[in-house]
Curated annotation (Swiss-Prot):
<feature type="compositionally biased region" description="Basic and acidic residues">
    <location>
        <begin position="18"/>
        <end position="30"/>
    </location>
</feature>
<keyword id="KW-1003">Cell membrane</keyword>
<dbReference type="GO" id="GO:0009903">
    <property type="term" value="P:chloroplast avoidance movement"/>
</dbReference>
<feature type="coiled-coil region">
    <location>
        <begin position="617"/>
        <end position="640"/>
    </location>
</feature>
<dbReference type="GO" id="GO:0005886">
    <property type="term" value="C:plasma membrane"/>
</dbReference>
<dbReference type="InterPro" id="IPR036961">
    <property type="entry name" value="Kinesin_motor_dom_sf"/>
</dbReference>
<comment type="subunit">
    <text>Homodimer and heterodimer with KCA1. Interacts with CDKA-1. Interacts with At4g14310.</text>
</comment>
<dbReference type="GO" id="GO:0005524">
    <property type="term" value="F:ATP binding"/>
</dbReference>
<feature type="region of interest" description="Disordered">
    <location>
        <begin position="588"/>
        <end position="615"/>
    </location>
</feature>
<feature type="compositionally biased region" description="Low complexity">
    <location>
        <begin position="652"/>
        <end position="668"/>
    </location>
</feature>
<feature type="compositionally biased region" description="Basic and acidic residues">
    <location>
        <begin position="589"/>
        <end position="600"/>
    </location>
</feature>
<feature type="region of interest" description="Disordered">
    <location>
        <begin position="1"/>
        <end position="52"/>
    </location>
</feature>
<dbReference type="GO" id="GO:0009904">
    <property type="term" value="P:chloroplast accumulation movement"/>
</dbReference>
<dbReference type="GO" id="GO:0005874">
    <property type="term" value="C:microtubule"/>
</dbReference>
<dbReference type="GO" id="GO:0007018">
    <property type="term" value="P:microtubule-based movement"/>
</dbReference>
<feature type="coiled-coil region">
    <location>
        <begin position="53"/>
        <end position="84"/>
    </location>
</feature>
<comment type="similarity">
    <text>Belongs to the TRAFAC class myosin-kinesin ATPase superfamily. Kinesin family. KIN-14 subfamily.</text>
</comment>
Length: 1264
């Protein structure tokens, strides 16, 4: 296998898993280069040193030059193709933009014409509204009385009607102490702000229409002026309500060519001095001039666009005004809303103004005992209010001269008081007896402003009898209304009682039925509830058992670890004892040798020492056997979990033959049957490709999956103390994942993996930097997901991996390796053919036996030269650590683990060890099985080291298995995209013969495009499978420019064919008028002009359909538009006579009034025409039904009303009564709506209705 070098450029080919080929087979096979790199090798012994090096450089330069030339030619051809394609696209876009520009110009012209027609109507509406508002004059006076407080005593005000207020003066000198005043509107204490504003609203409308409007709040202090203008938070006053009404009216009246803008000015008038309340808010506000020429003032104005901004500006002005109540009672507050209307079409600009004035208190007119500055303030207030009254009185009496110059207030508001402006004064009074003088003063002032005279005493009698007559008249009207209302209530109650009885019967039946259904549902619910409870109990017990098993497994693992540690310590102690014994034995041997020189030393003493050393050796062998048994038990428990996961693969895969170390290097090491690939569980006939479900798809959830997902997502390392606790928690979660997959079984293995996939990969990425996870557990989890991907992806199952002997190396072999002289095992790069694999060097040497072992062997009768290798625990740990270092980041080795079952892989490693190290082989004398145990220990150590290494991450990259999973997923996505690309290319090259094939091709291309976009979306969201940097796309998206162009061409072709079909349908008559025939031919010519927007492959179909329609229209006879027989149209001339209908649909029409409802049956014939069946006469329902074909609305386009009546005279009377109107345009509009209603009732004609609506045939409005 070859390992690709890491570069900064993307390579979309998954390298390292191609089949190995012998040198002889590679010579005749053409391979497409996957990158710009080339490998060139020349044998060293074929050329002299200098000449061979020079020749290799020259050949390399020639190859690079040729490669550059080929790339240049290819790039030049691509640039030419791209230029042609861009020119075609630009030309098509230019034509499309031209069409859009023409349509835009037509729409603008239509908008101008519409605005020109509407503008006079709007102006006329404004004029009529202002005339209606000023029928009784431009000045109106309203009177409002506020509610009394508890300490103010009784009220002296009465309200005879809505326009009269009566004051009880309690003057006994008069014959009638009550005085009455008439105003335009009178409001009692019970009237709220909303009712008041409903009468003020016309003035706001007039201001928006272009008139200047002023609204005054007048009255004594504490009479309710400020409340009327400002209101409260719950009941707002005129300020907020007027502006909101202006905004609502402006939004409803604004168009694309006209708009309104609003600005606000707030100032107060104190002692004839103006104070701008907005000048302190912002320094750069625009200015506006107000008042007459002699008294012009400059004020700040702020633009407002909504009610909230208006209230913000108003509150800011109130804050600048201050809270001095003594000053506010003698100050006039003016809020001016400036309205600007502009129309870009008529170039009309209208500016108007709405002034809301909160006047000072009117009690200043009667105060006489004040002195000092306050008297001056009161005099100014008296002067301004009196001048305002004079101006209003002059306006209502229509005098020639209006005294605006008498007060600064009237001079400022002069443009809002005279001329065409409107003025409203709201008089606020307090109905308490203690305020009688102020009440009379306010009412007299208001009456003088309105130019009315209060009632006198000598007219009291007349007024009294007039009131009596009015009361009597009102009472009679009320009695009549009450009588009529009671009659209507009786009739309604009778009808309601009848309907209620019917409803009671129906409800009783429904209740009975509901009771039966409810009883059935309750019984079913109880049974289902019992089943759910039982199921919950069973699941709870299973969950509890599973937790107990996991706890037991964890406890057993801890105990096994403790036992292993104890065994290691025991072994170390025994080894130290062995060394002591060896030293003692050497001393004893030396002493024996010295004593053997002495002939008097007896021989049994030496035999006794030999027996003692043999006993010690036996004891040591027993301890070693116990340790081997314990290690074997731990190994079995460790492999038990992984063997269950790979049981399915082992059962279905073919046994791989053990590799021979003597095999020829040119022989293929693995074929399809012996590559260790997983069996495919998907159907390969259609080449379908599926990945593990992405997070965007709906994944089936299980209780175990939900528990594991929550546990993995909620795991927080910060909550643990120390790395040991974090590692213990993380490893327990990984073991739970493996246990959940085992419990799910082979049938639900993929579902549980897909359910917890995102959580598992997120957990692994989160814990990788901490380096606390057991990498063997990580490897097992990774292998589960890669094998799940292999089982669902056919194109991955043909991947071949190198045999295990390619990854193993004996020390001091003839293979090419690095120049390191270290004798310890490590990474040594070994090149096999065209691949680069690092071989793991297993450094094992036969050890020399000690004298003690030799003595024991001689005593037992064994040959001294047939000793066996003893592998210690330290040596096994050393091999395992070196194997782990070798496997870190080794993707070829990770592929070997994925594609080869664990048991088979360990067997191959054991076979290689037995063949490579003869001193570990089993001989006839080795009957104890120690050698077999040593091979098992060595193979297990290598397997464990490799398994731990391929699961270890090397920051900033993930582990080797994670990188392999990413490469496999990229290969699957690449295959999917290429498959869809091939399908789309095939469809794009097909030629459509008719409209049906066009629709099928368009639907197929749209379906392929939808699938491609779905795969792209899945790629972007599949973050768990890809470990890419900087968020770049993992798979190159093939260009779909040709397919997109064909799809756009098919869409245009489909639209052209639909229009041709509509023209053919309109031409399905016996005779056509000249104008109609000319219009149809022009439409066909326009379709011919749209042909360049299609691709060449679609031209024949479109041209054929257009030519057929053109010939059909040409063959139809034509007649003059103004022939005499055209004035008498008939049903036969405008529609076919086929009246055969397979199914009738019934509609009932009720025209109201005294006429009975009538029924019309509608259907469709074979020509897709609307056919109706109804009574010939409405008044004769039993006179017999007639069947007629209903003409389309386009037939009535050029007919007069009389001609339409003649057409409807041949149809049932019900149709003519529903369609005929007073005018021809109205009849066409009503008939269009009726035709749509009837046709939509027939399912086969609904598509026809849609086409007619798009073509503009069905119109609800009057046709021009």
């Amino acid at each position: 296998m070859a390992e690709q070098k890491s570069t900064n450029m993307w390579n979309w080919e998954v390298t390292g898993f191609e089949s190995k080929k012998s040198p002889s087979s590679e010579e005749g096979v053409h391979r497409t280069p996957s990158s710009m790199l080339r490998r060139y090798s020349i044998p060293k012994n074929s050329l002299p040193p200098h000449s061979s090096e020079l020749a290799s450089k020259v050949q390399s330069l020639k190859d690079k030059v040729q490669l550059a030339k080929d790339d240049y030619v290819g790039l030049r051809q691509e640039a030419t193709d791209l230029q042609e394609y861009s020119n075609a696209k630009l030309e098509r876009v230019t034509r499309y933009l031209g069409v859009l520009a023409d349509k835009s110009r037509k729409l603008d012209q239509y908008a101008l014409e519409t605005e020109a027609r509407i503008s006079p109507l709007i102006n006329e509406k404004k004029r009529l509204f202002n005339d209606l508002l000023t029928t009784k004059g431009n000045v109106k006076v309203f009177c409002r009385a506020r509610p009394l407080f508890e300490d103010e005593g009784p009220s002296i005000i009465e309200f005879p009607d809505n326009c009269t207020i009566r004051v009880n003066t309690s003057d006994d000198t008069l014959s009638n102490p009550k005085k009455e005043f008439e105003f335009d509107r009178v409001y009692g204490p019970q009237v709220g702000q909303a009712s008041l504003f409903s009468d003020v609203q016309p003035f706001v409308q007039s201001a928006l229409d272009g008139s200047n409007v002023s609204i005054f709040a007048y009255g004594q202090t504490h009479a309710g002026k400020t409340y009327t203008m400002e209101g409260s938070n719950q009941d707002r006053g005129l300020y907020a309500r007027c502006f909101e009404e202006l905004m609502d009216l402006a939004n409803s009246d604004s168009t694309s060519a006209s708009q309104f803008s609003f600005s606000v000015s707030v100032f107060e008038l104190y002692n004839e001095q103006v104070r701008d309340l907005l000048s302190g808010c912002q320094s750069n506000l625009p200015k506006i001039n107000m008042g007459l020429r002699e008294s012009v003032i400059e004020l700040s104005q702020e633009k407002v666009d909504n009610p909230s901004e208006f209230m913000r500006v108003l509150n800011s002005a109130f804050q600048n005004r201050g809270n001095d109540k003594s000053k506010s009672t003698v100050t006039h507050l003016i809020v001016s809303i400036h309205i600007c209307y502009s129309n870009t079409i008529t170039r009309e600009n209208v500016i108007s103004k709405l002034s809301l004035v909160d006047l000072a208190g009117s009690e200043g007119l009667t105060v006489e005992d004040d002195n000092g500055d306050h008297v001056t303030d009161l005099l100014h207030v008296t002067n301004s209010i009196s001048a305002l009254g004079d101006v209003l009185s002059s306006l209502t009496s229509k005098r020639d001269t209006i005294p605006y110059e008498n007060s600064f207030l009237t001079r400022i508001l002069a443009d809002s008081l005279g001329g065409s402006s409107k003025t409203l004064m709201i008089v606020n009074i307090c109905p308490s007896a203690r305020n009688l003088s102020e009440i009379m003063s306010c009412l007299n002032y208001a009456a003088r402003a309105r130019n009315t005279v209060p009632s006198l005493g000598n007219r009291d009698t007349i007024k009294k009898w007039r009131d009596v007559a009015n009361d009597a008249r009102k009472e009679v009207l009320e009695k009549e209304r009450e009588n009529q209302r009671l009659k209507q209530e009786v009739t309604g109650l009778k009808q309601a009682l009848k309907e209620a009885n019917d409803q009671c019967v129906l409800l009783y039946n429904e209740v009975q039925r509901a009771w039966r259904v409810s009883f059935t549902l309750q019984s079913d619910l109880k049974s289902e509830n019992a089943m759910v409870v039982d199921k919950h109990k069973i699941e709870k017990e299973q969950n509890f058992q599973l937790r107990n098993q996991i706890a037991q497994l964890l406890q057993l693992e801890q105990e096994q670890k403790l036992q292993a540690q104890q065994q290691d310590s025991t072994i170390q102690n025994l080894q130290s004892k062995v060394k002591d014994l060896e030293s003692q034995l050497s001393k004893a041997l030396k002493s024996d040798m010295t004593r053997s020189r002495d002939p008097l030393e007896p021989q049994p003493r030496a035999a006794e020492n030999t027996l003692d050393s043999s006993a010690v050796t036996k004891k040591l062998e027993e301890e070693l056997k116990k340790r081997d048994a314990l290690i074997e038990r731990l190994h079995e428990e460790n492999e038990k979990l992984f063997d269950r996961l790979t049981e399915k693969s082992v059962a279905s895969s073919t046994q791989v033959s053990s590799p021979s170390s003597k095999a020829s290097p040119t022989v293929q090491p693995a074929d399809v049957d012996s590559a260790g690939t997983l069996p495919s569980s998907v159907d390969k006939n259609e080449g379908t490709i599926t990945l593990v479900k992405s997070s965007s798809e709906l994944v089936k959830t299980t209780p175990a999956g939900e528990y594991l997902t929550a546990a993995l997502n909620d795991f927080d390392p910060e909550q643990y103390e120390g790395l040991a606790a974090i590692a213990d928690g993380a490893n327990k979660l990984l073991m739970l994942v493996l246990a959940a997959v085992i419990k799910a079984g082979a049938s639900r293995e993929h579902e549980i993996l897909a359910e917890i996939r995102d959580s598992v990969f997120s957990f692994i990425r989160k814990m990788e930097p901490r380096r606390v996870m057991d990498t063997m557990l990580v490897s097992r989890v990774r292998i589960l997901y890669i094998r799940s991907l292999l089982a669902r992806s056919p194109e991955l199952q043909s991947i071949k991996v190198s045999p295990v002997e390619r990854f193993l190396e004996k020390p001091y072999t003839g293979r090419t390796r690095s120049s390191s002289g270290s004798s310890s095992p490590g990474r040594s790069p070994v090149r096999y053919y065209d691949e680069q694999i690092y071989g793991f060097k297993v450094n094992l040497k036969p050890e020399k036996k000690s004298k003690l072992v030799s003595v024991v062997s001689r005593i037992r009768g064994h040959d001294q030269d047939t000793g066996r290798q003893q592998v210690t625990g330290g040596k096994l740990r050393e091999i395992q650590d070196e194997a782990k270092s070798f496997a870190i980041g080794n993707k070829p080795l990770a592929a070997l683990f994925v594609h080869t079952p664990a048991g088979e892989l360990q067997r191959q490693i054991r076979s290689w060890l037995a063949e490579s190290f003869e001193f570990l082989s089993v001989t006839a004398d080795d009957v104890s099985g120690v050698t077999t145990g040593q091979l098992e220990l060595l193979s297990t150590a290598i397997m464990d080291g490799w398994m731990a290494g391929v699961g270890a991450a090397v920051p900033p990259h993930t582990d080797a298995l994670g990188q392999l999973l990413s490469e496999y997923a990229k290969r699957v996505y690449t295959s999917q995209m290429q498959h869809l690309k091939d399908i789309a290319g095939t469809l794009a090259s097909e030629e459509a013969e008719d409209a049906g094939q066009v629709a099928k091709l368009r639907s197929a291309l749209e379906s392929v495009d939808h699938k491609r976009r779905k795969i792209l979306q899945q790629m972007r969201s599949d973050a768990a499978l890809f470990t890419l940097e900087e968020g770049s796309s993992p798979v190159q998206n093939p260009s779909t420019a040709a397919e997109d162009s064909r799809l756009a061409s098919l869409i245009s072709l489909d639209a052209i064919l639909k229009q041709v079909k509509e023209i053919t349908r309109q031409a399905s008559v016996h005779v056509l008028s000249k104008s109609k025939k000319k219009a149809l031919l022009e439409s066909l010519d326009e379709l011919n002009e749209r042909m360049p927007s299609l691709l060449d492959v679609d031209h024949p179909c479109a041209q054929r359909e257009i030519d057929t329609a053109h010939q059909l229209v040409e063959t139809i006879p034509e007649q003059e538009d103004n022939l005499q027989d055209e004035k008498r149209p008939s049903i036969d001339s405008i529609s076919s006579t086929e009246t055969d209908v397979s199914q009738w649909n019934v509609l009932q029409f009720n025209t109201g009034g005294s006429s009975a409802p009538f029924i019309i049956k509608c259907g469709a014939n074979s020509n897709s025409e609307l056919v109706i069946k109804a009574d010939a006469r409405i008044q004769e329902p039993k006179g017999g039904e007639i069947v007629r074909v209903v003409p389309r609305p386009s037939v009535l386009e050029n007919m007069s009303l009389e001609e339409m009546k003649q057409v409807f005279g041949q149809l049932p009377e019900a149709l003519s009564s529903l369609a005929l109107a007073r005018t021809a345009d109205g009849t066409r509009a009503r008939y269009s709506r009726l035709y749509r209603t009837l046709a939509m009732k027939v399912p086969s004609l609904r598509d026809l209705v849609g086409e007619l609506e798009k073509g503009g045939v069905l119109k609800d409005t009057k046709s021009t």
